[in-house]
From Swiss-Prot:
Organism for this UniProt entry: Clavibacter michiganensis subsp. michiganensis (strain NCPPB 382)
Gene that specifies this protein: rplV
Source organism phylogeny: Bacteria, Bacillati, Actinomycetota, Actinomycetes, Micrococcales
Pfam families: Ribosomal_L22
Record-given protein name: Large ribosomal subunit protein uL22
UniProt xrefs under PROSITE patterns: RIBOSOMAL_L22
Described purpose of this protein according to its UniProt entry: This protein binds specifically to 23S rRNA; its binding is stimulated by other ribosomal proteins, e.g. L4, L17, and L20. It is important during the early stages of 50S assembly. It makes multiple contacts with different domains of the 23S rRNA in the assembled 50S subunit and ribosome. The globular domain of the protein is located near the polypeptide exit tunnel on the outside of the subunit, while an extended beta-hairpin is found that lines the wall of the exit tunnel in the center of the 70S ribosome.
């Protein structure tokens, strides 16, 4: 089983909005996920698209380094999660000398691509045959 990891940190999109996009692609084939992200209207879909493409390139390089064959259509998103990054705190002036805080949140996004094991293929085939 080939596994490749790609991370992007300090992306200026709120974790809540990024999680909506990541939930759409979790468990899907990598090429299918790229197609979904390409046409998704959410703003977080662009950095996640680039991240999945980077993870696919990482898998390609890893397979070349170990002289093993990698079928890119077999890659699927094994794990994908969004963690909260640092928060940029800004202040907006208000009436009578007051200031309201504005939190500009950032995200750390991680995507793990993998090829299915023989055991994974057997269990999915068994479930499909019922």
């Amino acid at each position: 089983m080939v596994e490749s990891i790609a991370r992007v940190r300090h992306i200026r999109v709120t974790p809540q909005k990024a999680r909506r996009v990541v939930d759409m692609i979790r468990g899907k084939q990598a090429e299918e996920a790229l197609a979904i992200l390409k046409f998704a209207p959410q703003g977080a879909s662009e950095p996640i698209y680039k991240l999945v493409a980077s993870a696919m390139a990482n898998a390609r390089v890893k397979a070349d380094a170990s002289n093993s064959f990698l079928a890119e259509q077999d890659l699927y998103i094994a794990k994908a999660f969004v963690d909260e990054g640092t928060t940029l705190k800004r202040f907006q002036p208000r009436a009578q000398g007051r200031a309201f805080r504005i939190n500009k949140r950032t995200s750390h996004i991680t995507v793990v691509l993998a090829t299915p094991d023989e055991a994974d293929v057997a269990t999915t085939t068994k479930k499909a045959s019922k």
